[in-house]
A protein has these predicted regions:
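Core mixed alpha/beta domains of very large multi-subunit molecular machines
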Residues: 50, 213, 218-248
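Phosphate-backbone binding interfaces of nucleic-acid-interacting proteins
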Residues: 1-224
Length: 248
């Protein structure tokens, strides 16, 4: 079972100990932690950028030469007179004024870390044109399987209260600056109260001898209305195979 420490922190009102210490306590009193994933490290260096310019590559039909605005957040990269960074991109959906995710030189492609063969980017020429890092697709960021184009960010993709800003840390913006603990499933077979982040948060509070208060929504009594309900008709077309069929 995967447990997000970011979610756990939202459910408690005390400070967690360092990750190594917390893992040790969980191992001793709850169950074995098979793996600890540091998402912040996986996405280290990834930045939100705006594509300011997009032109056809002079030496390749399927490549584009872009100029991106990273808010001057990344040091030690070549910039033009306007402070923009040049990146060559092969995605068919790249265009000016879109928002994308940039992996600058010295950063590592997140998907390659998961594959066990970390690939670190650098500044290099592609068909004679300098490209500083890459604009990433969903599969390269390990957030999806799409490789047909780069990730196109829009305001509706963001968590509430967040805004697209050039140079924003991708992991921090999307809540990926997190640790995920993978706790063995066998431990939970006799602990159905831990079948979820809330139950694990309660258990961690107990392990650390801290008080725990369930969120308000957890204690609300469910009320089922009968005035504005949507009409629902249910029929059983195969009673010989399904003698009892119910809808709730």
């Amino acid at each position: 079972m995967k447990v997000s420490l970011s979610v756990i922190k939202q459910l408690i009102n005390f400070e967690l100990p360092p990750v190594d210490e917390l893992v040790q306590r969980i191992n001793q009193q709850l169950g074995k932690v098979d793996r600890v994933e540091n998402l912040a490290e996986r996405y280290r260096g990834a930045r939100v950028v705006r594509v300011v310019e997009c032109a056809k590559h002079p030496n390749a039909d399927r490549l584009s030469v872009t100029k991106i605005d990273d808010g001057m957040a990344v040091p030690d990269v070549l910039r033009d007179e306007n402070g923009l960074v040049q990146v060559v991109c092969g995605a068919p959906n790249v265009q000016a004024d879109m928002w994308a995710v940039w992996l600058p030189p010295t950063s590592t492609v997140p998907a390659s870390i998961l594959e066990g063969e970390p690939f670190t980017l650098d500044a290099r020429k592609l068909r004679g044109v300098l490209s500083q890092g890459m604009l990433a697709a969903a599969d390269e960021l390990a957030i999806g399987t799409d490789h047909e184009g780069i990730v196109a960010l829009t305001p509706r993709d963001l968590p509430a209260g967040k805004a697209l800003q050039p140079g924003a840390d991708f992991a921090a913006l999307f809540g990926l600056d997190d640790y995920v603990l993978d706790i063995e499933n066998k431990m939970f077979t006799h602990r159905p109260d831990c079948f979820g982040q809330l139950g694990v948060a309660r258990e961690i509070a107990g392990i650390l001898h801290q008080p725990f208060t369930s969120p308000t929504w957890y204690n609300l009594e469910q009320v089922f209305g009968d005035g504005d309900s949507v009409p629902l008709a249910v029929s059983n077309d195969i009673p010989q195979l399904v003698p009892r069929f119910m809808a709730v």
